[in-house]
Amino acid sequence: MATTVTCTRFTDEYQLYEDIGKGAFSVVRRCVKLCTGHEYAAKIINTKKLSARDHQKLEREARICRLLKHSNIVRLHDSISEEGFHYLVFDLVTGGELFEDIVAREYYSEADASHCIQQILEAVLHCHQMGVVHRDLKPENLLLASKCKGAAVKLADFGLAIEVQGDQQAWFGFAGTPGYLSPEVLRKEAYGKPVDIWACGVILYILLVGYPPFWDEDQHKLYQQIKAGAYDFPSPEWDTVTPEAKNLINQMLTINPAKRITAHEALKHPWVCQRSTVASMMHRQETVECLKKFNARRKLKGAILTTMLATRNFSVGRQTTAPATMSTAASGTTMGLVEQAKSLLNKKADGVKPQTNSTKNSSAITSPKGSLPPAALEPQTTVIHNPVDGIKESSDSTNTTIEDEDAKARKQEIIKTTEQLIEAVNNGDFEAYAKICDPGLTSFEPEALGNLVEGMDFHRFYFENLLAKNSKPIHTTILNPHVHVIGEDAACIAYIRLTQYIDGQGRPRTSQSEETRVWHRRDGKWQNVHFHCSGAPVAPLQ
């Protein structure tokens, strides 16, 4: 009988101590390596709760962190899998967040902001040279190595980072934190390294005045501002900022990513590399005051989300079941925090300047209709009823990372592509249908009497002899569609399908089938490679 050997290397080599941070599926604890006595931070991921896709993301994060060795990046020292848990052993950084340190300083000037952004840009440049795009640059991920004066800035959290080849631009999914997202990501266009520079521009703007360039409580309006590049330098606070600093911000917040300054170029900007003569040395007390309010607002919103996670097992981009034993006291805490948030968020003076030239709110409505009825009698109208794959959004939270928007977008893509396939069937358009299907499409369907059918000829028969000639009204309702994303280029959709139609005697009929379609993406296009349909044959086999 074979014996399963369970790895216990982390347990054997490290001693765990107090918690120093928490996430939706992980906790960070201080640890000590027993043989050396050196302190580290262990990110402990509960792998029992992870999906296959989450496992892929974890492997990607570890792979990326192993690549990066720079004085301004939190370094990964070890990556260990044990039964039920994965341990990522990082530098222990004890200086806290950069933004929290700034507000505690007695003196803070433009030159200090220049030194901060220089270190951030050095970290970003190293990432880009190693073919890594961080995708989630924001204040929460900018830490200080220690409490000592002049401690190095450290870039942390590569959970959303991706690997790219050179200056490759592609659609890597909708991911990041709302206030720091670039226009190209919001437009769902191909993107790459320039997204990190855009986020650096937002961070630099905040470093100089203590509030962000783009702001609106309505996330849609916020996104409209970002896509339009609608920011300005209002008086009086910007009057004391040097033109060179504003110039660098403008080059970072350039809408066209091809024209946006690179990390290498930004480090050569006079305001960065010649700060002693170019950047102002004047103390910026108003910036410090605004930054205190900005920090307080970030922390409160973080507390609200953490409480929601605790009380509802809820995270951005995921929908899970709340524990049955949740206390009403915890629920009350959530409501109390929400009320505090409303009070704080309604005060424009609290670290957020109102926009003077924000764009008009224009609504773009996408219909998440999915539709997959039986092969013989496809509907003219399709409806999704009770779509269980609808993913909950968080409450207004511009500092909350959107972790699974890419998966959500892919699910909607699958539904939309399936709808296009059904549209082709509805129209009796075999040519359009064939473009969406793999030439070697396989299927199990009632019409094939339990046999596996391969290729398009079997389906062509129904197009030419039934579908193209059908003129009677048909209505389909799709019940409880589930989309399973399988890696980057595969997905499966399953659903119950009700089809209403008029039979040959003019009587209304309803048929039900349970169906599954498997999709594979090739050359950027989804193709149906297999489907399985249960039930009785819809078309009369005579």
Swiss-Prot record:
Q: Where is the composition biased (Polar residues)?
A: 354-369
Q: Which PROSITE patterns match?
A: PROTEIN_KINASE_ATP, PROTEIN_KINASE_DOM, PROTEIN_KINASE_ST
Where in or outside the cell?
Answer: Cytoplasm, Cytoskeleton; Cytoplasm, Cytoskeleton, Microtubule organizing center, Centrosome; Sarcoplasmic reticulum membrane; Synapse
Please report which protein family the annotation says this sequence is part of. Belongs to the protein kinase superfamily. CAMK Ser/Thr protein kinase family. CaMK subfamily.
Give a yes or no for keyword Kinase in this entry: yes
Question: Region Autoinhibitory domain: which residues?
Answer: 283-292
What's this protein's name?
Calcium/calmodulin-dependent protein kinase type II subunit beta
| CDD domains from the UniProt entry | STKc_CaMKII
Where does this protein come from, organism-wise? Answer: Mus musculus
Membrane topology term reads: Peripheral membrane protein
* Annotated region described as Calmodulin-binding, given as residue ranges: 291-301
In the record, Phosphotyrosine modifications are located at Y17
Q: What does this protein do?
A: Calcium/calmodulin-dependent protein kinase that functions autonomously after Ca(2+)/calmodulin-binding and autophosphorylation, and is involved in dendritic spine and synapse formation, neuronal plasticity and regulation of sarcoplasmic reticulum Ca(2+) transport in skeletal muscle. In neurons, plays an essential structural role in the reorganization of the actin cytoskeleton during plasticity by binding and bundling actin filaments in a kinase-independent manner.
